[in-house]
């Protein structure tokens, strides 16, 4: 008997009367079952896409804004075999100790810096000069120049894509963002005189050639669990399929929690993932999702990876240190 029929037999007597005149095929019973569930749980709000718990929405969630991702590593040595190391070297507890210098981690570079996106989205108060300075400090030199020289419509379309031209939501945000940027470009009168976007950029002593480097991650889709979200983001941003990786089991995700320069509390949870050294990973500009999300991706040694992640991003640098410590002391058994 189909499970839908089983539930139909147990349902409320009032619904049985309705069922008497309905289609009793499997498709009809499925529809009936879904209606029963809808009526039984109509009082429960949807599941929060941020924390994964029922009873509230994202906007009503008190947990930090949470993303899920992966720290992807490999041993850049085709001759390395963990089983061989463990069986032939009695002093090895993990199979990694002598290969730590050959461990590499996959980092992705953001397409646009966080500060550039924050200013272009208009998520700031034009009178909050200190906050605006922080966003400018995080931009690349090229992004600063573009804010001064490229028409706003072009910047907006490049940031959001073609959907931004027709979406009412984007259209409303666009006009607010345009007005704020025009205020900044025109200059703001304060006690010390007039401050403009150009003057703030000129006095900035911090310079970056590329946007931030980090790990693939993203927000959870409705009804998606943590690991599924992390592996989906990995696939979308790096092109690596979940079938080609080994997720290290029996360890908690590596976490970074912090308050952003926008004063929002964030939490990023990363699963540790192993891939074979011969797996090709390249930036694919024909992959629209990859092109929209990232600017580059590359394998780095642990030391070079620490250098690539910006010094002020302490929490993300600690993720790499934690992973190195983990592989020195914990023995994940890798198998096909």
Language-model segment annotations:
Residues 62-66, 99, 263-265:
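A short catalytic or substrate-binding loop motif that flags glycine-/basic-rich loops and adjacent residues
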Residues 42-45, 99-102, 207-209:
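A short, polar/charged loop/turn motif at coil->beta-strand junctions and beta-hairpin connectors
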Residues 68-69, 103, 213, 269:
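Residue-level detector of short, conserved catalytic/binding motifs and their immediate flanks
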Residues 114-123, 133-138, 144-146, 150-336:
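Unchanged
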Residues 1-54, 58-74, 79-91:
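Intrinsically disordered, low-complexity linkers and tails
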Residues 70, 75-150:
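Long, charge-rich boundary regions
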Residues 58, 94-95, 202:
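Generic recognition of flexible, low-complexity loop/linker segments
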């Amino acid at each position: 008997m189909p499970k839908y029929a089983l539930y139909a037999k147990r349902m409320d007597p009032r619904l049985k009367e309705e069922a008497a005149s309905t289609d009793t095929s499997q498709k009809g019973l499925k529809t009936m079952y879904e209606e029963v569930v809808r009526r039984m749980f109509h009082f429960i709000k949807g599941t929060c896409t941020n924390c994964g718990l029922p009873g509230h929405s994202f906007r009503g969630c008190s947990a930090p804004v949470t993303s899920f991702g992966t720290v992807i590593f490999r041993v850049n040595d085709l001759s390395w075999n963990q089983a061989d190391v463990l069986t032939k070297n009695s002093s090895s507890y993990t199979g990694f100790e002598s290969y730590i210098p050959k461990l590499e981690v996959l980092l992705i570079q953001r397409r646009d810096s966080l500060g550039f996106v924050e200013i272009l989205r208009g998520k700031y108060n034009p009178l909050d000069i200190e906050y605006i300075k922080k966003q400018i400090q995080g931009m690349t030199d090229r992004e600063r120049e573009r804010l001064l020289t490229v028409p706003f419509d072009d910047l907006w379309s490049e940031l959001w894509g073609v959907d931004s031209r027709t979406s009412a939501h984007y259209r409303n945000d666009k006009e607010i963002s345009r007005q704020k940027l025009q205020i900044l470009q025109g200059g703001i009168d304060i006690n010390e005189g007039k401050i403009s976007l150009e003057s703030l950029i000129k006095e900035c002593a911090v310079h970056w050639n590329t946007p931030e480097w980090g790990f693939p991650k993203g927000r959870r889709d409705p009804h998606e669990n943590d690991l599924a979200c992390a592996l989906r983001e990995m696939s979308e941003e790096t092109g690596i399929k979940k079938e080609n990786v080994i997720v290290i089991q029996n360890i908690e995700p590596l976490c970074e929690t912090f308050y952003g320069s926008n004063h929002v509390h964030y939490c990023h949870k990363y699963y540790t993932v192993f891939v074979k050294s011969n797996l090709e990973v390249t930036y694919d500009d024909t992959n629209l999702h990859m092109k929209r999300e990232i600017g580059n991706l590359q394998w780095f040694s642990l030391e070079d990876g620490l250098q690539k992640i910006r010094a002020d991003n302490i929490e993300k640098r600690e993720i790499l240190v934690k992973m190195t410590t983990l592989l020195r002391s914990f023995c994940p058994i890798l198998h096909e």
